[in-house]
Swiss-Prot record:
Free-text tissue specificity from the UniProt record: Specifically expressed in oocytes.
Cited InterPro entries: SYCP2-like, SYCP2_ARLD, SYCP2_SLD
CC per GO annotation: condensed chromosome, centromeric region; female germ cell nucleus; lateral element; nucleoplasm
Protein name: Synaptonemal complex protein 2-like
Disruption phenotype: Reduced fertility in females: acceleration of the age-associated decline of fertility in female mice, due to progressive loss of oocytes. Males are normal and fertile.
Gene: Sycp2l
Highest taxon in the source lineage: Eukaryota
Keyword Nucleus: yes
């Protein structure tokens, strides 16, 4: 078998790179590679030649070869490549790549970006395997990495990767070498540039990484002296000096909130504390940290994204969630007199806590100005138009309060739940979505978390001694922007007023910091120092005002629900989840919350497997449904399942009639101006629909259940769109012989009579709304009654369409055969005439 060096030499002599690519696809052997002093010479010549020819893919292959040399020989003290001068060669390669990045023609080249990523990966691997190489990187390579981060013309994604590599190399460097670095002239200029970039970068995660780089480059008491040089504003410098290594993540949150607020209208990041956040109905929990009081959501103007961190049940690292503008279909903001709901619809599902989600819903206090921040970060083009928002307001303002019973819950928990009125949300079939929110009375001072930088005890002691007289927490001037106000953008969704004011949050354990960027782990350790809170801090857990609701510590222990996890999207780092279970902590038990969310229709949508084009102008007819008031208990329903099919999120079709409270059914008349989304034929095979039928069989269904008849689309709603598998031919398209035939007339009469028979059978079972029995009709039965009737009419309509289509085809085929018959007869006569002419000629 050829060695890797021999393959590189073959590529040097012009034999191509395909053999190298095949070699790299093999599994790592971890057997030391054999190479000599000529390897570095060949690598240097090849990489520079490929960069000059803009063959960035070949350059990536050569960089991966260097990675293989170090990975296959992890125990070697100082590899030969380092002794021969690999780091200076890499500096020259990096200068060429960064020069190409600044060039506008090649800046968007994907292969060039991949080559830079491979270069950064190579530098990271070398720093992990060679102490000498890490020290050499501090002299020159670190400075070039830092100035690339500060370059405004570089894309944010490249800046973020470069910054992550910079921090990892600094983390691997010895403390004494970092102390020397901070006193060098070039490093001082770099640190001032990094501090300036914090003000303009426009992305919270990059602001954190820049602050981390400054903390790593300044050791001990040097940080206090240098901070006054980095920031012209004395208040900012004093705030930065309050960042402690062992409480870096939460102290940095306080500092950045203070910094962004002081920038006023020039700020590039807006941070707001949210009340609750959901991904396709599943609660996303705040990271479990004693000092992190608020669940922060960041609107980033620079990267045009919304980012936040959530609790990771299977890791000490926080899980990052990033919603990019280009990944969104639309976003809407719905406001009532208590909260604001920020809802994002995504083009493709993203993986959050090992589950795919296409809709992200975040609740804020109504005092916060999230409208202005969201428009500045995402653009007005991503905000849903007013007519679509008004439709979604009706759907998200309490349509799901009809169903409140979850099978299998004990009666005591159900009685406790009846006294509380919660925001209606979706309940998965296999996992209750737990509503874990914070109190409405938002704090002015954000909390801090347990993230820490990896430092020695000597360095930490020196930092603490230098700050003996300083308060441990940033004062109350670290406010999130409460002054940003905007008027209500939609009708008030009154049903949202019943959201729970106080709730509890479980602190499972202390955690480190955010997720690593690719395989660039920042090696942040948990802190063992005193975690006592200052006087201006409060515990996340609140006492409930309603005595029927217990605190979180008094509730049942956590349960792990086995979930059917959808396939995960590929990630660059290659780290895949190891378990197929997601940890769910149900806080509100015995309560079913449903969210009949209709997928947002922005433009014409063609459903797979359907021959009908759905447009935003489609509308169904106006129907009314009178629901007498029900006393005593909440309506019952079964849990609902959701599944992703062909990229669309299918849900069980529901009646569009909302309920204004958890224990009453009132008369409502809803204007259905929503496009048809689900093919009527599909919901009969839906597992959720079958689950509902099974659950109904175990309940007592009172006689005389009422459902308002939905008129047939064949006669009463000719202008409404009908989602069927085939389109009905119009009378003008039908041949005249078929239209006037006795069969056609008889078939039309048959269809009409059968339709009327269906409606008559339903009317015979109808109970007047004024009867007492009608008040006992479950909401699910009323809805199911309407769906059965509609399905019956749709089935008849499809049959009607198919017969007419077959009649049309039959007429055309007969006409074609008739023409062929005439042609055959004419040909026969012509042949016979030719035969007679030959006979006479003889």
């Amino acid at each position: 078998m050829s060695t890797l060096q021999s393959l590189i030499i073959d590529g040097f002599h012009g034999n191509g790179f395909h053999m190298i690519e095949e070699y790299l696809q093999q599994k790592e052997s971890h057997v030391p590679q054999k190479y000599n002093h000529l390897l570095l010479h060949h690598l240097d010549r090849l990489i520079k030649e490929e960069l000059d020819k803009n063959e960035f893919q070949n350059c990536s292959l050569l960089l991966k070869c260097i990675q293989r040399f170090f990975r296959d020989d992890p125990d070697h003290e100082e590899p030969l490549l380092i002794q021969q001068g690999l780091i200076p060669k890499m500096v020259s390669w990096f200068e060429i790549i960064t020069g190409l990045l600044i060039t506008k023609v090649l800046a968007s080249e994907a292969l060039l970006t991949n080559a830079l990523e491979d270069f950064l990966d190579t530098a990271l691997i070398i720093s992990r395997h060679s102490r000498k190489a890490t020290v050499q990187m501090l002299d020159s390579f670190i400075l070039r990495l830092g100035f690339l981060v500060a370059e405004d013309s570089v894309k944010p994604s490249i800046q973020q990767e470069t910054l992550a590599t910079l921090n990892c190399i600094l983390n691997a460097a010895p403390q004494e070498e970092r102390r020397k670095l901070s006193s060098a002239e070039g490093a001082c200029c770099l640190m001032k540039e990094l501090a300036r970039t914090i003000l303009t970068v426009g992305d919270y995660s990059q602001q954190v990484a820049l602050s981390e780089a400054l903390c790593r480059m300044s050791v001990g008491r040097q940080r206090n002296d240098l901070a006054m040089q980095w920031f012209e504003n004395t208040a900012l410098a004093e705030a930065f000096k309050k960042i402690k290594n062992r409480e870096f993540e939460t102290d940095c949150r306080q500092f950045l909130n203070f910094l962004n607020n002081r920038l006023g209208n020039q700020r590039r990041v807006y941070s707001f504390p949210c009340l609750a956040a959901f991904a396709d109905g599943q609660e996303m929990r705040k990271p479990a940290d004693e000092k992190l009081e608020e669940f922060w959501i960041d609107f980033n103007l620079g990267s045009q994204s919304v980012t936040f961190y959530i609790d990771n049940a299977e890791s000490a690292l926080w899980e990052p969630v990033k919603l990019l503008k280009e990944a969104m279909v639309k976003f809407i903001i719905i406001e009532n007199d208590r909260i604001k709901m920020f809802i994002v619809y995504l083009k493709q599902p993203i993986v959050i806590s090992k589950r795919e989600a296409k809709k992200i819903e975040i609740h804020f206090d109504r005092q916060l100005g999230i409208l202005q921040a969201s428009i500045q970060a995402l653009g007005e083009d991503k905000q849903a138009p007013s007519f679509q928002t008004s439709v979604l307001v009706k759907l998200f303002s309490g349509l799901e309060k009809e169903d409140g019973e979850i099978p299998g819950r004990c009666e005591r928990e159900a009685e406790d739940a009846e006294e509380s009125t919660l925001l209606p949300e979706l309940v998965d079939a296999e996992a209750d979505r737990c509503l874990i929110t914070r109190c409405f009375n938002v704090q002015t001072v954000p909390g801090v978390s347990k993230g820490s930088l990896e430092i020695t005890n000597t360095e930490e002691r020196s930092l603490e001694n230098s700050k003996q007289d300083e308060p441990e927490q940033v004062t109350s001037e670290y406010d999130y922007p409460l002054d940003m106000q905007e008027p209500s953008i939609q009708n008030q969704a009154s049903d949202l007023n019943n959201i729970k004011e106080d709730s509890a949050f479980a602190r499972d354990r202390e955690q480190d910091r955010r997720m690593p960027f690719n395989d660039r782990n920042h090696d942040l350790l948990e802190s063992n120092e005193d975690s006592s809170l200052s006087t201006n801090e409060r515990s996340w857990t609140q006492n409930h005002k309603r005595k029927s609701l217990r605190t979180y510590s008094q509730r049942k222990k956590q349960r792990v629900s086995s979930l059917r996890i959808l396939p995960l999207s590929p990630i660059r780092s290659g780290h895949a989840p190891e378990k197929d279970e997601a940890e769910l902590v149900p806080l509100w038990k015995g309560i079913s919350r449903r969210n009949d969310s209709t997928l947002l229709k922005i433009s014409e949508t063609k459903l797979r497997g359907s021959s009908v084009l759905l447009t935003s102008g489609a509308s169904t007819q106006k129907i009314g449904l009178e629901k007498p008031e029900r006393r005593g208990s909440e309506p019952s329903s079964s849990t609902k399942k959701t599944r992703v099919t062909d990229g669309l999120h299918w849900r069980e079709p529901r009646s569009p009639h909302p309920s204004s409270g958890p224990s009453s059914l009132e008369y409502l008349e809803v204007e259905e101006n929503i496009p048809e989304i689900v093919n009527r034929e599909s919901f009969m095979g839906n597992s959720s629909f079958k689950h509902k039928l099974e659950n109904l069989g175990h309940r007592e269904i009172p006689d005389g259940s009422v459902a308002a008849l939905k008129q047939s689309r064949l006669e009463d709603a000719p202008g409404s769109p009908v989602v069927t598998d085939t389109s009905t031919p119009s009378q003008e398209d039908m041949p005249g012989s078929v239209n006037g035939s006795a069969f056609k007339t008889a078939f039309e009469n048959f269809t009409r009579d059968l339709k009327r028979k269906f409606e008559l059978e339903l009317k015979q079972r109808e109970i007047p709304f004024s009867l007492e029995k009608a008040k006992e009709a479950p909401a699910c039965l009323i809805r199911l009654w309407n769906q059965i009737h509609t399905c019956r009419l749709d089935t008849l309509e499809r049959f009607h369409s198919s017969v007419l289509r077959e009649l049309s085809g039959l007429e055309k085929n007969l006409q074609t055969l008739k023409c062929l018959e005439k042609d055959a007869l004419a040909s026969l006569l012509f042949v016979l005439s030719l035969g007679r002419e030959r006979t006479f000629s003889r």
